[in-house]
Regions:
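Conserved, structured core segments of small domains
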Residues: 1-110
Length: 110
């Protein structure tokens, strides 16, 4: 089955202004995805790693991409196709609590 990488963006304000019952249903969707084999995690502090021309590693604290909302979490999910992946993540906490979820097809290298 195809795999998809999801990146959830959201913040505390959006989470708190969402009704508790909607948040609970969204957390239940996370549980369903875990039962289906998804790897789900909350984002920690990001670092940027560079090694131009393999001549030396440089590490910078903080994310490379700047967005209106912080990255809240990541998941790798199984879905039949992109439409199925979208349907699944449309019910997770970041999507429901005024955030956004990006869905990226995972193209496995051979």
């Amino acid at each position: 089955m195809p795999k998809f990488i999801t990146i959830g963006y959201g913040d505390k304000d959006g989470y708190e202004r969402t009704e508790k019952s909607a948040r609970d249903r969204a957390h239940d969707q996370d549980k369903t995805l875990r039962r289906e084999g998804a790897l789900i995690g909350i984002a920690g502090a990001a670092v940027q790693v560079r090694n131009p021309d393999a001549a030396g590693v440089a590490v910078t604290n903080g994310p490379y991409t700047v967005s209106k909302l912080p990255v809240a979490g990541f998941a790798i999910i199984d879905a039949v196709d992109l439409a199925d992946a979208i349907a699944k993540v449309s019910r997770v906490p970041c999507a429901v609590t005024h955030g956004v979820v990006e869905v990226w097809p995972l193209i496995e290298a051979v």
